[in-house]
Amino acid sequence: YDPYPLEIIQQEHQVVFLHEHFHMVRRIFTDGRQAPENWWPTLGGFSVGHWEEDTLVVKTTHLSPENLVWHTGMPFSGAPDTYTVERYTFTDDRLMYTAEIFDPTYYEEPYVFSAGRVLAPDGMILEYECYPEYSGF
C-alpha cells in the first residue's frame, strides 16, 4: 500500500484520486458507465464505483500484469478475467482500505489485504522527484 500522500476529489460523476507517488491520477466513475471495448490494460485499470453509506466500493478491470507485483510483490496475471474490488471507508480521522484481488490464474480464492491512512485535511500533494542529495547517492 502506498505510503505517499493521496488527495481525494469527489465530483458529481466521478471520484478522482491524486497520488503524490509518480503523480498518478486515478478516476473512479460513479455514473454507471462501463469500460470501452477497446480499453487497454494499465497500472490503474478502469474503475467504476458506488457508495454504500460511508464506503466507496470500487471494481477495477483492465489491469496490466505489472500492477500488483509493483505494489506488493504478489503475482498478478492481468488476464481479461482478473479484477479487483476495493472498499474505502471514511471515519472521523482515518481512511480504511480493503482490496480483494480476483485472479483465477494464480488464486483459487480472492487475495485480500487491508490498510489504513490517517486523514490530514490540511495536507498537500508535493512534487514527486528523486533528488540525489536526498537519496544518499
List where the protein language model places each region.
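PEST-like low-complexity, intrinsically disordered acidic/proline/serine-rich tracts
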Residues: 1-137
